[in-house]
Amino acid sequence: MKFLLLPPAVILFFAAFVITGCSTANKTASKKDWVPLFNGKDINDWIVKIQQHDAGVNFGNTFRVANNTIQVRYDEYGPEFKEQFGHLYYKTPFSYYHLKLEYRFVGEWVKTAPTYTLRNSGVMFHSQSPYSMPKEQDWPISVEMQFLGGLSDGKPRPTGNMCSPGTEVMQKDSLVPSHCINSTSKTYDGEQWVSAELIVLGDSLITHIINGDTVLQYSKPQIGGAVVNRYDPAIKKDGQLLSSGFIALQSEGQPVDFRNIRIKDLSGQYKSKQAKL
């Protein structure tokens, strides 16, 4: 059998072609892995739950859509905020995933809201269902990736923190006693868009990422602790690990915009690895 010897230049050309083709295929597959949770047009795939109102009631048109963003506004609330804290839940729960979104604080804070809500919002995850919350319950039993905006006073105010309404988490093999853990992020003043990412591996490791930088990690999210009121006692089973739950965007007195909300399912990748351990 005779073999055809090709010039080195020709071999390099075909090798580059194959590598480029594989790279393009991988990038295409990677892009397809990301699923948008917000279509830029409406919130039909989302469920509103606002304190003092039943699930599904978008009181005061709190959550609305404009310019391909979910906008949180309070202009129809009247003179008093009355602690009508709200959350906008995606319709299905998740367990192992990588969530990406962008947010920005805009406009005037509602002065009748609690002072801690100034330039404050967040995304709740591993949350109880909105339909399991009594009308008067303030926060869902969940874990929060808290978003804070700088106050333009030169003082640090990190974002991408962790807060734990009705939950607890672990760091260095110990339960964290505080309600919130500050991240190592920079401070973001004004109305600039900030990119936030959340990597959730069931009831194992949780990672917070802000503008591409890993700013916080912890593990073993579980039900426990306080800072949640008027809940159904049957739901709050202290010590129960949280391996899945709903994702929700927060409204608590500060106008905020959300956009480019998308998710990548990691369950196939990580559950199979854990099963082999």
Annotate each PLM feature.
Residues 1-30:
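Bacterial Sec-dependent N-terminal signal peptides
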Residues 22-277:
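Carbohydrate-interacting regions of secretory-pathway proteins
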